């Protein structure tokens, strides 16, 4: 809508500039569209900013869905007595918004964010805080995530094991896991967690 209403770029160009801004400022920054209009027009255009924000939120809401088998896996884990937590590098309100929109918030006993802790995954501190909040023993705790460095290595460095789901793990990462004999299991589908735990 921004392009259709006066942003003098085609959609691919606008998206490219926006991606650069997001890379520079981070995904939690709240004024990506403000900067986009400043960069392209030389000044902030409130109407175009509003169009960008509304379009982004409408698309996000329309596309936000749990992966297949996520709900079944959460039900299974809770039925087996597991306490579940979220460790996220997203700001707190955004993480809660995701959990509420996905209707999975009630499965989680704790939500720990980098905003609250002052450290981001893979920093050991965020895992230590999560373990402390959940009264967890690292040797009996498992991080389930999709990012090798942030989720799996961070968890292993905190003394936990990890399960990587649907991850773009490189051959180099796999070789490192084998060489270091890291307690990291790689699976393709979240539903496979039920066969491991």
Each language-model region and where it sits:
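A generic structural signal for short
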Residues: 21, 61-62, 83-84, 115, ...
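Short, acidic loop-to-helix structural element flanking the phosphoryl-transfer center
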Residues: 30-31, 58-84, 124
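Active-site neighborhood of HAD-like aspartate-dependent phosphohydrolases
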Residues: 1-14
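Asp-based, Mg2+/Mn2+-dependent phosphohydrolase catalytic module
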Residues: 71, 75-78, 87-197
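An amphipathic alpha-helix signature
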Residues: 1, 30-34, 92
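Helix N-cap/coil-helix junction residues
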Residues: 7, 42-43, 104, 136
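Pocket-edge positions in alpha/beta enzyme catalytic cores
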Residues: 21, 25, 62, 118-119, ...
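A metal-dependent, Asp-based hydrolase signature
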Residues: 8-10, 19-55
